[in-house]
């Protein structure tokens, strides 16, 4: 979904509005038209709703079955043939007529003439006649004339004959044709997420490809003169660009296709240059440059283009969250602090990516847990602590990962959940019930 704004970039597919403002002189300290007066501060729920209102599922595309895991079906799938396509044996054993072995017992076995063998993937060499049998393998087609299989451990071969030691009923150890699916049966409805198990069913139903909702192409931009790549030596005031790599991984984990725009310096023109390929993307995710500092150019540039929806959320960590558009492409600007970036991704970017893929389960299920640490919160904010949850008998207990500073990335790496403290709550005492968002399985 694209927005109408005054934004235009050289080389983009959109043309400049005749009323667009002239570009301002390039300056590292230029902050565009940011109004430093109080701006509306949205709740987390309001901000997420505003973002999702601007996001729509992508168009459908054909996807080879082997590449469809995790994708969302754009249309229902029906079986093109019966599954299984023929009645087959569920056991290694002997194909028999049940009536021929009705009197069999260990003390008085029934003797049947052995006509041959049926292997999986081959046609039976003969039909089963009265008082005869065929050796049969698991998955092999049931020979004509037979209606049951005696397990190999319940019989013995001697001198070209088979001794059957137990009776069996008609249908024993068989998989009937069409018992899994009949031709025309619904295999999966539109909107279903494709799992490995479903891929197997789709393959058995005759499908080699499926129509899936598209995967969103996400342009990722990190900003800041201080950023250096992992492994590079750090000079005074410089830090490693962790956000770039955590975002790339998080976007791919959520089903997005990354367009890596690299690192923009704190210069207006470099920021513009990095956004030239925005027309190739369906979402832009940036980090840094969204607050009120003199070098926070991202928000200033977007304000100048009248492309900002909101830029403050009553959230800790991550209050300066920007939602805007670049040449009509939605942009979510996350703060530069590493933990703020990841919390913002979880609360806002991940739901947007899932919606673009046709998912309806946009938020992770929440659980109630008992906190083992006191939690202190500014009551005007909704705070998300990083926690480690574990199952303790019939309840879930949770404790903090340690230092909760928004710069302490390890607090997020060690966490398997987020602990939610809502607005209006100042303190949560040890032993109190809290809401948590599991990020990984809780043992």
Q: How would you name each of these model-derived features?
A:
Residues 2-4, 24, 28, 32-45, ...:
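Helix-rich terminal scaffold detector
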Residues 1-3, 8-13, 18, 30-32:
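Generic low-complexity, intrinsically disordered segments
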Residues 33, 42-45, 94-260, 397-398, ...:
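Short, glycine/charged-enriched hinge/interface segments at domain edges or termini
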Residues 61-66, 70, 74-75, 121, ...:
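Flexible glycine/proline-rich
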Residues 73, 85-86, 114, 124, ...:
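Short, conserved secondary-structure segments in the cores of folded domains
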Residues 28-108, 112, 359-384:
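Short, low-complexity N-terminal leaders and the immediately following helix N-cap/first helix
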């Amino acid at each position: 979904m694209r927005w109408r704004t005054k934004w235009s970039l050289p080389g983009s597919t959109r043309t400049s509005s005749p009323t667009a403002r002239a570009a301002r002189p390039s300056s590292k300290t230029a902050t565009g038209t940011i109004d430093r007066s109080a701006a509306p501060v949205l709740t987390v729920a309001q901000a997420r709703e505003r973002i999702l209102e601007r996001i729509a599922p992508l168009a459908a595309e054909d996807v080879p079955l082997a590449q469809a895991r995790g994708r969302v079906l754009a249309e229902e799938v029906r079986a093109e043939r019966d599954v299984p396509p023929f009645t087959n044996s569920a056991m290694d054993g002997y194909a028999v007529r049940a009536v021929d072995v009705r009197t069999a017992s260990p003390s008085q076995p029934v003797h049947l003439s052995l006509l041959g063998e049926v292997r999986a993937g081959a046609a039976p060499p003969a039909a089963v006649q009265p008082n005869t049998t065929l050796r049969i393998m698991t998955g092999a087609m049931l020979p004509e004339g037979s209606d049951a299989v005696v397990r190999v451990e319940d019989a013995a071969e001697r001198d070209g004959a088979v001794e059957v030691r137990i009776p069996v009923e008609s249908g024993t150890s068989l998989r009937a044709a069409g018992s899994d699916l009949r031709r025309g049966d619904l295999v999966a409805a539109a909107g279903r997420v494709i799992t490995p198990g479903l891929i197997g069913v789709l393959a058995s139903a005759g499908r080699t490809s499926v129509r899936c909702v598209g995967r969103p192409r996400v342009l990722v931009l990190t900003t800041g003169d201080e950023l250096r790549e992992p492994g590079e030596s750090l000079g005074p005031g410089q830090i490693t660009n962790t956000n770039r790599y955590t975002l790339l991984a998080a976007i791919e984990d959520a089903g997005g296709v990354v367009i890596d725009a690299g690192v923009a310096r704190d210069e207006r023109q470099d920021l513009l240059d990095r956004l030239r390929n925005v027309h190739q993307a369906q979402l832009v995710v940036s980090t840094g440059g969204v607050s009120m500092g003199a070098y926070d150019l991202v928000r200033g540039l977007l304000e100048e283009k009248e492309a900002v929806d909101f830029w403050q959320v009553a959230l800790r960590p991550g209050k300066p969250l920007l939602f805007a558009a670049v040449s009509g492409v939605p942009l979510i600007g996350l703060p530069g602090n590493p933990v703020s970036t990841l919390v913002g991704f979880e609360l806002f970017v991940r739901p947007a990516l899932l919606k673009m893929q046709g998912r309806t389960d946009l938020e992770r299920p929440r659980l109630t847990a008992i906190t083992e640490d006191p939690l202190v919160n500014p009551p005007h904010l909704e705070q998300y602590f990083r926690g480690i949850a574990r199952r303790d008998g019939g309840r879930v207990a949770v404790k903090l990962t340690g230092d909760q500073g928004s710069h302490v990335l390890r607090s997020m790496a060690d966490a398997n959940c987020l602990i939610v403290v809502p607005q209006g709550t100042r303190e949560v005492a040890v032993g109190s019930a809290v809401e948590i968002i599991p990020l990984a399985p809780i043992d």
